[in-house]
């Protein structure tokens, strides 16, 4: 197959940042993707509908002329979040989901939830009105190994929450383990998972073998090869409970290349090329559209995009920049460590 035409994709987990960084990265998303769930972990975080309204306006202002893109806003869940404010934002159409960050789990998550009981009034209201909860599924207790955080989160936090509130709609974001995949598959209702393009490509060797490679470090951290293969199988299966969420997370290079580097991989610019490569390897190009363009909208109660894009396979590798330049500084682009021959042509 030399070309494939699919409905315009969406990104169900995206970091756009703010200010000069937002202005420098947004075109890489809006050029290809029609919609994206926007992460709220700014400094300070997006915790109220008023915050979300202002952030959405900044995003739309940063869009290049002629780009059609809809930011789907989220709120950062805290122990003091107002159920009434969440419901008002959801009913207005502004808020698509609320994001749960266990405190300390990832970038700018220190204001997240430490005591789930204090967040229950909001979660109960969300369950009542059908508003999804997006979760960063990792525990942060120091005695838990970083490679086990997702599995322990499922057992100690997520499963008890879902048993208590079975009507709450939950998205496990950036699933990285076979444990997460199996847990989603076993659920009868109200559970789905997003998968990144980079977790389909790298395992933890990419970070550690031959020297520490900070531009492959993200949270949740890449896992063993058996987990990567489980993610691939889920992504290409056509199962409607799995969909693309890039978790594209730009950091300027000095914040990655240092003694205590930030977690995050910047993938927006080459995500679709990487995915076409992966799905071709798995003999599943006919299911790429489901993963990128159909399953996510169905889960979030939206219509799929009417616009189409075409990916073409060319003989010579596609050349992506090693870095992009923003007003905040240079950002290194994800390198899948093999040539990419698929690219978006229309």
Swiss-Prot record:
Keywords: Hydrolase, Metal-binding, Pyrimidine biosynthesis, Zinc. Zn(2+) 1 binds at residues 13, 15, 99, 247. Homodimer. Belongs to the metallo-dependent hydrolases superfamily. DHOase family. Class II DHOase subfamily. Its EC number is 3.5.2.3. Its cofactor is Zn(2+). Binds 2 Zn(2+) ions per subunit. It comes from Rhizobium leguminosarum bv. trifolii (strain WSM2304). This is Dihydroorotase.
């Amino acid at each position: 197959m030399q070309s494939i035409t699919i409905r315009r994709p969406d990104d169900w987990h995206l970091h756009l940042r703010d200010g000069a960084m937002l202005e420098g990265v947004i075109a890489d998303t809006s050029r290809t993707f029609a919609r994206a769930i926007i992460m709220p972990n700014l400094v300070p975080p997006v915790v109220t509908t008023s915050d979300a309204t202002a952030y959405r306006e900044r995003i739309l202002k940063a869009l290049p002329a002629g780009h059609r893109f809809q930011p789907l806003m989220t709120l950062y869940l805290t122990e003091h979040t107002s159920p009434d404010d969440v419901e008002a934002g959801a009913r207005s159409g502004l808020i698509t989901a609320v994001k749960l960050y266990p405190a300390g789990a990832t970038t700018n998550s220190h204001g997240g939830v430490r005591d789930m009981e204090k967040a229950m009034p909001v979660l109960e209201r969300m369950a009542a009105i059908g508003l999804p909860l997006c979760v960063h599924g990792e525990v942060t207790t120091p005695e838990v190994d970083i490679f086990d955080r997702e599995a322990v989160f499922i057992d100690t936090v997520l499963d008890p929450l879902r048993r208590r509130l079975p009507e709450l709609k939950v998205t496990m974001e950036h699933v990285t383990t076979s444990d997460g995949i199996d847990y989603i598959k076993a659920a009868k209702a109200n559970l789905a998972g997003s998968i990144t393009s980079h977790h389909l490509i790298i395992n933890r060797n990419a970070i550690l073998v031959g020297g520490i490679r900070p531009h492959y470090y993200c949270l949740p951290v890449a896992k063993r090869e058996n987990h990567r293969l489980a993610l691939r199988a889920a992504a290409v299966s056509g199962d409607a409970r799995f969909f693309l969420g890039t978790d594209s997370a730009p950091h300027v290079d000095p914040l990655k290349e240092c003694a205590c580097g930030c977690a995050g991989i910047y993938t927006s610019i080459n995500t679709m090329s990487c995915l076409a490569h992966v799905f071709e390897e798995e003999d599943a190009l006919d299911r790429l559209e489901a993963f990128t363009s159909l399953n996510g909208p169905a889960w979030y109660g939206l219509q799929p995009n009417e616009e189409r894009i075409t990916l073409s396979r060319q003989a010579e590798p596609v050349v992506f920049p090693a870095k992009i330049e923003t007003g905040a500084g240079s950002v290194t682009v994800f390198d899948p460590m093999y040539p990419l021959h698929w690219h978006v042509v229309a």
